Amino acid sequence: QLAFPMPTSIPASKSAAATSIIRAPAKKPPVQVSQASLRSDDPSYLTLGAGYYDINDNQGAAEFRLEWRFKEMFWKIHPFVGLMGTSDAAVYGYGGIAFDWKLGKFVFTPSFAAGAYRDGDGKDLGHVIEFRSALEIAYEFDNRHRLGLIFYHLSNASLADNNPGTEVLSLGYSIPFD
């Protein structure tokens, strides 16, 4: 700390102000980045969803979805598991990863999952193994609940000769769990 003597004719209050102006700035400790500082406080979420299965084809059905998104692992990546069913008795159990990108109150979430599919009386997707690529846009309320729209594509990625794929548009409500 560097200070210069002040003349005695300057009042003490002005002397203190002048001394603080000419002091050398204090050194700050170096910034340390750890895994903990890269984490956010996003909770786990339970999502309930309903929508329209096979929106681009003639075998449409109602879609219902239950999904558990775990707390962030790191860099805004969430692992998740889910179960989707349709009014045609198709069932899809899956697990994957999602990435939250927040812009104000809106959350954009691309995700990818793999799982097992049973067609029931619905559309034959060609293989039991199916992959899901999705984009969700949600509004996050002050209490951290989210209301969002998700569009996703299911496909077996040509694991079988028959690979018609399907698209789903669904509305979801996500409830936070700390």
Name the predicted role of every residue range.
Residues 48-52, 68, 79-85, 99, ...:
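Transmembrane beta-barrel strands of outer-membrane/channel proteins
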Residues 64-70, 95-101, 112-114, 135-139, ...:
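Residues on the lipid-exposed face of transmembrane beta-strands in outer-membrane beta-barrel proteins
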Residues 1-39, 178:
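Cleavable N-terminal export/targeting peptides
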